[in-house]
């Protein structure tokens, strides 16, 4: 069937189209020079209009496009329109049945996902939305027409809602499921650890995102959450023991976690290991030779002697090296050196050994060539950094030769080699769930190992437990932004906060939390205490009052109570402790640095050394150019890491903290704490 413009109508209209032909499932609109084929599946509306004399047909298409035919005889136009409209409506009804079936399938899939007994992850939402878009693309009807049909309207709107508001609906589904699950699985959460898990711990354990960061404040039960997470995966059948990997930063922490797993899960098949043990395992699986860890890594005294000896040797053999080292130590570190062959001074060599150890460790951790390391420095720093690299180069060469002669590897080499095996596909990761403790201490090198493992299996999940408020290891390469910008590095996921501490009272928590959050870059979180405290829970005291304080404590502290005495440096250990066993025989006193106290707790804590100066707290910035380039970029907030270090010290205590300061040169932290309401009595109360 065809409709044409009249001769006069065609002449007067001067329009590109003058005829329309009805096809099997569409129309063909054409003119002398133009032709437009419009299938019914692109047609949104057909309109028949009457002008002054002639008829007009309008075909509405997507994206507001309209094709018009002018100059047709009016009665013929009406007749053609009725026939066309009937054919179009008949086709549309048939296609609406097809569309209805597709939409019903999509809605059924959405409902199944929304109400399944499990976590609704971001990845699952992406798959649902991809299915909806694919389903829409396969529909025979234009989307804009679906609301016309009763069989399609509601399901189409539901699909559309999941495209536009999917994240909100996903969160609602997870909230419902979590509430139901915590009630249904109460017996599990009450018995999986020695004490029942609290709601925030339970919510972290059941979170099934592919990347989960659990912010675990001091004393909030992070190890319980890690153990419970592994148990939950097994309990739910989401993983076999061999598919779960737990990672800790130190051997002792890994052993403690394994002990907890054996005790609570009654299995040896789920194992915690250090990053170095993981790298060693990967290399062993890919090589016939079992790697030997060098004595340079396992024996600290031997390592420092090795570095001192080779440093002295290079200064002996090359005057230019000796001159360069003199310049470095005097100008940058402000050390006073003896005249002449300063490198032969055994005290100086011993003092420098620790620095050489750290600098070489950073170079080994970075890996790559000298030119690759140079590229890390900015234009202003590069010339001096290059000089320092040249001075360190003989030590690096001697280190590598010693490893080769020993047929051994160091820890940095282990991780570099493991990442290389993973990237080349020589090792296929069996782990679908990676659980990491103390995540705030992770370095870029270790993060690369995690990323390499996850690239092997895009569906693998990362469950990271840490606390950016306790990040105190930048000097050894830890990168805080791997925690504070977690999603940028490890993908979109979820952040959970453990909101209850079982260690310190409310007053200690209040002071510590307000003190640490004076730095706006720290992640915001609430940490509630179960016990109240009073103003005496945190006290500023002059450092001369230490003896008087211990005298006072000996009158009421029980022998079972632990008193932790903390300082920024080892050499600040007070001499009074040498006579403590006889003067205060019933006081359980332990001294350590604040860094060493991480993970410890005590009934009472005494923090020493809140004074200004070279060994002050906060410590003055004394980074060499080598550290400035190879370590993660410093934070803009003043003394950010030192502030976190004092937070760690404060939060070791259960009942009471005394902060001892210098009256003549008080630390800037003293004023900060006093303004937060910490009292400054003249004598111990």
Feature annotation, model-predicted:
Residues 433, 558-560, 588, 598-663, ...:
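Conserved helicase C-terminal RecA-like lobe
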Residues 135, 143-176, 181-182, 234-408:
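A basic/glycine-biased coupling hinge at the interface between accessory DNA-binding modules
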Residues 213-214, 220-226, 492-494, 501-587:
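Helicase P-loop NTPase motor core
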Residues 127, 136, 140-218, 224, ...:
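Conserved helicase NTPase motor core
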Residues 447-535, 680-681:
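Conserved RecA-like helicase ATPase core segment
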Residues 210, 240-243, 268, 458-460, ...:
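Short glycine-/polar-rich loops that comprise or flank the Walker A/P-loop
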Residues 16-18, 23, 30-37, 44-52, ...:
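P-loop NTPase Walker
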Residues 1-19:
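Anionic N-terminal interaction surfaces
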């Amino acid at each position: 069937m065809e409709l044409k413009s009249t001769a006069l109508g065609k002449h007067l209209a001067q329009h590109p189209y003058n005829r329309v032909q009805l096809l099997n499932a569409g129309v063909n609109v054409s003119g002398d020079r133009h032709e437009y084929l419009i299938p019914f599946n692109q047609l949104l509306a057909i309109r028949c209009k009457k002008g002054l004399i002639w008829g007009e047909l309008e075909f509405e298409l997507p994206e507001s496009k309209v094709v018009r035919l002018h100059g047709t005889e009016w009665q013929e136009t009406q007749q053609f329109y009725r026939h066309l409209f009937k054919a179009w409506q008949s086709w549309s009804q048939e296609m609406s049945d097809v569309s209805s079936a597709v939409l019903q399938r999509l809605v059924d899939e959405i409902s199944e996902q929304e109400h399944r007994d499990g976590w609704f992850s971001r990845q699952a939402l992406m798959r649902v939305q991809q299915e909806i878009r694919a389903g829409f693309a396969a529909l025979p009807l234009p989307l804009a027409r679906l609301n016309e049909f009763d069989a399609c309207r509601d399901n189409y709107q539901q699909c559309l809602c999941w495209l536009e508001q999917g994240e909100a609906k996903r969160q609602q589904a997870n909230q419902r499921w979590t509430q139901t699950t915590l009630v249904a699985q109460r017996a599990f959460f009450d018995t999986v650890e020695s004490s029942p898990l609290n709601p925030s711990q339970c919510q972290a354990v059941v979170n099934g995102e592919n990347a989960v960061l659990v912010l675990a404040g001091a004393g909030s039960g992070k190890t319980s959450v890690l153990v419970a997470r592994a148990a939950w995966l097994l309990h739910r059948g989401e993983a076999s023991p061999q598919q779960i990997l737990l990672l800790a930063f130190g051997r002792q922490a890994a052993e403690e976690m394994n002990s907890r797993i054996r005790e609570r899960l009654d299995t040896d098949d789920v194992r915690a290991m250090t990053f170095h043990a993981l790298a060693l395992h990967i290399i062993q699986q890919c090589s016939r030779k079992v790697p030997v860890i060098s004595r340079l890594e396992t024996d600290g005294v031997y390592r420092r002697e090795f570095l001192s000896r080779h440093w002295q040797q290079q200064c002996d053999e090359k005057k230019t090296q000796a001159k360069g080292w003199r310049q470095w130590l005097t100008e940058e570190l402000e050390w006073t050196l003896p005249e002449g062959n300063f490198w032969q001074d055994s005290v100086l060599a011993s003092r420098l050994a620790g620095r050489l150890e750290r600098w070489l460790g950073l170079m080994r951790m970075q890996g790559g060539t000298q030119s690759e390391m140079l590229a890390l420095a900015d234009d202003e720093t590069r010339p001096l950094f290059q000089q320092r690299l040249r001075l360190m180069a003989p030590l690096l060469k001697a280190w590598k030769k010693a490893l080769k002669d020993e047929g051994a590897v160091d820890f940095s080499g282990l991780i570099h080699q493991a990442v290389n095996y993973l990237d080349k596909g020589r090792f296929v990761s069996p782990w679908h769930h990676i659980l990491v403790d103390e995540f705030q201490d992770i370095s870029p090198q270790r993060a690369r190992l995690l990323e390499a493992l996850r690239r092997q299996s895009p569906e693998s999940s990362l469950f990271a437990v840490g606390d950016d408020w306790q990040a105190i290891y930048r000097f050894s390469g830890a990168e805080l932004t791997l925690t504070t910008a977690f999603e940028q590095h490890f993908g979109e996921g979820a952040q959970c906060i453990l909101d209850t501490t079982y260690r310190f009272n409310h007053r200690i928590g209040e002071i510590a939390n307000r003190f640490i959050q004076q730095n706006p870059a720290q992640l915001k979180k609430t940490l509630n205490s179960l016990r109240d405290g009073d103003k005496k829970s945190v006290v500023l005291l002059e450092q001369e009052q230490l003896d008087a304080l211990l005298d006072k404590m000996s009158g009421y502290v029980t022998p079972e109570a632990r008193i932790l005495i903390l300082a920024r440096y080892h050499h600040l250990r007070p001499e009074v402790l040498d006579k403590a066993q006889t003067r205060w025989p019933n006081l359980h006193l332990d001294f350590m640095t604040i860094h060493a106290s991480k993970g410890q707790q005590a009934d009472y804590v005494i923090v020493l050394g809140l004074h200004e100066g070279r060994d002050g707290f906060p410590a003055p910035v004394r980074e060499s150019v080598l550290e400035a380039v190879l370590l993660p970029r410093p934070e803009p907030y003043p003394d950010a890491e030192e502030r976190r270090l004092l937070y760690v010290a404060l939060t070791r205590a259960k009942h009471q903290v005394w902060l001892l300061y210098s009256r003549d040169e008080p630390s800037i932290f003293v004023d900060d704490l006093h303004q937060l309401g910490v009292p400054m009595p003249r004598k111990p109360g």
